[in-house]
Every structure is written in C-alpha cells, then in structure tokens.
C-alpha cells in the first residue's frame, strides 16, 4: 500500500498530539516501576503503591510510610535478590484484627533499616494485659518472616511497641537476622503488654540470629520446631527468657541441632527453658546452651519439663517428647529469693538422656526440684 503525503502528515500529527497530552500527576506514594528498578514509596498511599509495584522492583525503599488500619504491608513473593529498606518512621493504623502488620517472603531477600529509622507498632492502643488471649480485643501480630529462602537477611531493624508477637519465622531456610532491636519496655507499664514474644521459630531450617536486643513481656526466643538454629550474642530483658518449645501438638514437632550462646537474660521470669507438651509426641534433640548469664530471674533459672499445657504444668510428666543430647555449658547467674534455681520434671530416665552439664551455677532461689533428672544435673 502506498501512503499519500496527507495520510502520513495526519498520522504524524496525531502522534504529536498524543505525546503532547498532559500526564496525570502521580498520587503521593506511587512510582512507575519497570522491572528491576529502584522503587521508593512514602506517606499514606505508600503501602498500597509498594504492594502494587513490588514485582517490578530490585529495591524497595519505604520512607515514613503510614500503613492503613487493617492492612498488611504485603511484600511477599518478591523477585529474587530484592532489597527492602525502611527509612524514617513506619506506622500503622489502628484496628482490632489478627495481622500481620508486615509480611515479607522470597529468595535472597535483603531487609535493612536506614540510620535513624523506626518501625513503630504503637502497641499501647491494643495493650490490655491479656495479649493474644483476649477474645474481644484482637491484636495484630507484627512481622511475618515466612518462606524466606536462599541467603536472605534481616539486618539492623529497630522495632518499638509491638501489639503482640514480633517476629514469626516459619517455613524459612538460610535466613540470617542480625542487629535487631525490639523495644517493648512501654508494655511493662501496669503490666499491660503481654505475649510480646521476640522471635518465634517454627518449621524452619538453618536460621541464624545474632546480636538481638529484646525488651518484652514473653519469650525472647521460642523455638517450637526447626533444625540447625543458632542464636548468639543476645540481650533479653523483662520477658520469659530463652525457650525451646513448647514442643508437641503441632504439624511439625521436631527441634533438633540448636545452639544458643553468649546471651544475657536479665530481670526476666525464666532464664533457660525447655518445654514438652504433656501427652504429645515429638523430638527435642541436640540442643546446646552455652555461655548464658542470668540475673534477676524471678521464677525459674533453668526449667526443663515434660508436662506443659496451655494452662500450666500438670506435675505429671510424660515421655512422648524425649529430650536427648541436651548440653548446658557455663550457664550461670542469680534467681530472686522467691524463684527456683533449677526445675527438672522428666517422665522417665529414658525420656531425658544423654545430657552434658558443665559449669552450671545458678543460685539465690529456692532448692532445686528434680524428677527423673539425669545424673550430674541437679
């Protein structure tokens, strides 16, 4: 087909008009995100824009983002190698709901906090002393680190005033968390903060947490299931200490090859704790606590029990979750006079076996309570 001069000029004129048409101004927080670009989001619409554009970003910077009430900052399914950077202060609208407030997943993901940043849960809006036990005041969990694979990292985050549990680590492997600070000290006021666990780990492999500082009102660390887990260089204050379990009653009931070391537990309810669910089945094997310093422990310096239930301990330990290969090396410190130095409640000598305890010295509390404890322990 031969185009006449008038047709060509008409076509070019139309194209020129189209190019000259004004482009609508981008709303606050939104960015055009061609695949592999560095994306930045801010303000009240930043969360929605980040969620919509995440697939096309090689890096995502969140600057003073305000996440709407009842909305998860959903950064799941990120492209491999994506970097996520928190800048300024990240806040969340108030609503009674289960959360989470933040969720991130992917392979080789790098999450970090810029200098001076803060992720502020403003938990006092929910705190009522009941934590996640309330049926009327539902509180959002904070940060789901689920299905983070490869060599993913979470580095240098500053988190304040979580409504309830902070980090839920599930279905992840090869994840390293370093230099995280969780400051829930405000929850101590009138004992309103509750169930504010620092790190809950389940169904995960090869998880490393180093240099964490945790002020809270529940477990600093709780490993409910998982293998090849390292926690070192931690500081835990005000909560329930370092916990294995409770183990049992879940789809995955195996905790194996865990090394917890060089950590201080201060002004907490418990120091070192291992909990097996009464009547359940599972495995706790190859757990080591090394170079743990305790001070101001109010209830149990070291407690290892096979009769845990949600309502407390039954006093009649069972044997379905054997605790084997447990090592305590240089675990030392003080318990208050109303607490107990060491409690061991095992269902039988066979269900608690292969333990190695060296340089264990806990004092200041009531006399040890020991049932079917391996020799050389208490």
Swiss-Prot record:
Disulfide bonds join 39-57, 220-236, 346-352, 370-378. It is found in: Secreted. PbH1 repeats lie at residues 172-203, 204-225, 226-246, 255-276, 284-306. Keywords: Cell wall biogenesis/degradation, Disulfide bond, Glycosidase, Hydrolase, Repeat, Secreted, Signal. It holds the Pfam family Glyco_hydro_28. GO terms for biological process: cell wall organization; pectin catabolic process. It comes from the Eukaryota. GO terms for cellular component: extracellular region. Its EC number is 3.2.1.15. GO terms for molecular function: polygalacturonase activity. Residues 1-20 form the signal peptide. The active site is at 218 (proton donor), 240. It catalyses: (1,4-alpha-D-galacturonosyl)n+m + H2O = (1,4-alpha-D-galacturonosyl)n + (1,4-alpha-D-galacturonosyl)m. PROSITE patterns: POLYGALACTURONASE. Belongs to the glycosyl hydrolase 28 family. PANTHER family: POLYGALACTURONASE. This is Polygalacturonase. The lineage of its organism: Eukaryota, Fungi, Dikarya, Ascomycota, Pezizomycotina. The gene is PEPG1.
